[in-house]
């Protein structure tokens, strides 16, 4: 590219000068002034400007340093751990993705099943909504559908009653837990055992074979206690 000239330089011509007169230009550089003779203060300044480490002796072996793991700062260690964890996470994800890859037919089959389930759920919801609108439109005397929907299920009530009965039975002291019984309960237990023993002595099975009768009675009593605990 050429030199960019201003509008004045392009339109006006240069001034005519007489012979021997030089055209105006940049002024010649002024001759450097010679520094004055150095005094005592100048000598001190020159001494200060010289290399201050000229007489310093440094062992080259001290300049060689090794970056070891123990000498590294905590920040650098944390950065290294963060980088390694960040690099390991994508690899784990890639491994999980590689494990869950399914063939195209299986994907289409799963997608079709999901769509069928959604369609079935939508159909059931629409049918229920339609029945509710029909029930509201036609007033039926003795319609028990709202009451049936509001009441809890019978199975849930039965399960709750069974849990309450079991908790009550567990709260009652067993015959083996005499320390939890009161004096009246212990007296009642003794009366029951005495009555049961008298019935056993009066039974014909005891007269025929006492050991067999006692074993059968004890087994029956243990079964009753186990059933009460359950």
Swiss-Prot record:
Q: Which residues carry this modification: Phosphoserine?
A: 203
Q: Which residues carry this modification: Phosphothreonine?
A: 34
Give the location in the cell. Answer: Nucleus, Nucleolus
Annotated tissue distribution: Not detected in any tested tissue.
Compositionally biased spans, kind Basic residues:
1-11
- Per its UniProt record, what Pfam families does this chain match? SLX9 (PF15341)
Cellular component per GO?
90S preribosome; nucleolus; preribosome, small subunit precursor
**Key word Thylakoid present:** no
Q: Which GO terms describe its biological process?
A: maturation of SSU-rRNA from tricistronic rRNA transcript (SSU-rRNA, 5.8S rRNA, LSU-rRNA)
Q: Where do Basic and acidic residues bias regions lie?
A: 166-177
Bilayer-crossing regions? none
Does Cell membrane count among this protein's keywords?
A: no
Which intervals of the chain are annotated as region Disordered?
1-42, 155-187
The UniProt keyword set, sorted, is: Nucleus, Phosphoprotein
Biased composition, class Pro residues, residue ranges = 25-38
Which family, according to UniProt?
Belongs to the SLX9 family.
Q: What does this protein do?
A: May be involved in ribosome biogenesis.
Name by which UniProt lists this protein = Ribosome biogenesis protein SLX9 homolog
Protein source organism: Homo sapiens
The taxonomy runs: Eukaryota, Metazoa, Chordata, Craniata, Vertebrata
């Amino acid at each position: 590219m050429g030199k960019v000239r201003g509008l004045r330089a392009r339109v006006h011509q240069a001034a005519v000068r007489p012979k021997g007169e030089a055209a105006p230009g940049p002024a010649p550089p002024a001759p450097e002034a010679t520094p004055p003779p150095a005094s005592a203060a100048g000598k001190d300044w020159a001494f200060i400007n010289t290399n201050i480490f000229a007489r310093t002796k440094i062992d080259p072996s001290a300049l060689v340093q090794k970056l070891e793991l123990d000498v590294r700062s905590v920040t650098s260690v944390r950065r290294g751990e963060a980088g390694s964890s960040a690099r390991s996470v994508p690899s784990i994800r890639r491994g999980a993705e590689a494990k869950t890859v399914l063939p195209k037919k299986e994907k289409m089959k799963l997608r079709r099943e999901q769509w069928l389930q959604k369609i079935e759920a939508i159909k059931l919801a629409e049918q229920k909504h339609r029945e509710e609108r029909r029930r509201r439109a036609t007033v039926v005397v003795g319609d028990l559908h709202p009451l049936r929907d509001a009441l809890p299920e019978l199975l849930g009530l039965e399960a709750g009653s069974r849990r309450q009965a079991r908790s009550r039975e567990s709260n009652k002291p067993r015959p083996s837990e005499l320390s939890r019984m009161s004096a009246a309960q212990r007296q009642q237990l003794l009366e029951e055992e005495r009555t049961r023993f008298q019935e056993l002595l009066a039974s014909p099975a005891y007269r025929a074979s006492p050991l067999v009768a006692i074993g059968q009675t004890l087994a029956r009593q243990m079964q009753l206690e186990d059933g009460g605990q359950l």
